[in-house]
Amino acid sequence: MFGKKKKIKDTKGGMSPRSNRESVKTRAAAAGRVRIHHQNAQRQAMPDSTPSPSEFLYISNGAHYDQVIERIKTVKKTLWIGTADIKDLYVKDGRGTKPLLEVLSDLAKRGVEIRLIHAKEPGPAFRQDFDKYPALIEGMERVLCPRVHFKIIVFDLKAAYVGSANLTGAGLGMKGENTRNFEAGILSTNRDFVKNAAEQFDNVWMGAHCKGCKRKEFCGDPIG
């Protein structure tokens, strides 16, 4: 089963919660691409080189699939996804299609650290697909925060997407131009852009806003 998020291993199966925070921080520090500050382990992405300002790509509508989803397939070490809504999403596979979850499962098997923040539980089709990929139970961590409305994807802490598109077929997925949502976003490898996106994601991930949150009654399993 997809299961409820827990703060320890979910022995009944389902999407894995966050694992030990310290081990995650240690792995990131060892990778040498991030700096860790203060008790909330705020992370700053540090690309290997400073790209030119021209490396900002404006993405609209169907280009989200080609520029964002296809980039997910190329991740080597770290993938962070923040979305308000999450539904079953399919990607091209030769002449057919397959669930994005299969792509994420393949990444997890290769040791990619996958983090997912979402505002509400996924739909039933997504949950049914999830059960087919046991590698995600251990290989993908998640937190649920009902205040999340940002759409942020950080690729290997070297590139980031920030925009309007949710992790859905009509948002980032491969739905046709006449049925998909009208979306807009920015994809960039700019050092400051990636750092700011990663910091906002990590602040929510580490529960930096939980202490003063006034919506705790809507949060079934607080992050912090």
What residues fall within each predicted segment?
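Short, solvent-exposed loop/turn segments at secondary-structure junctions
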Residues: 85-87, 122, 166-168
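Short, charged/polar "capping" segments at the starts of alpha-helices
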Residues: 122-128
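Short beta-strand scaffold segments in enzyme catalytic cores
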Residues: 151-154, 186
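Structural recognition of alpha->loop->beta junctions
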Residues: 130-146
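Short solvent-exposed loop/turn micro-motifs enriched in small/polar/acidic residues
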Residues: 65, 143-147, 179
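Short Lys/Arg-rich cationic patches that frequently serve as NLS/NoLS or arginine-rich RNA/DNA-binding motifs
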Residues: 2-29, 33
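Signature of lipid phosphatidyltransferase scaffolds
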Residues: 2, 159-224
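PLD-like (HKD) phosphodiesterase/transphosphatidyltransferase domain
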Residues: 2-4, 32-116, 192
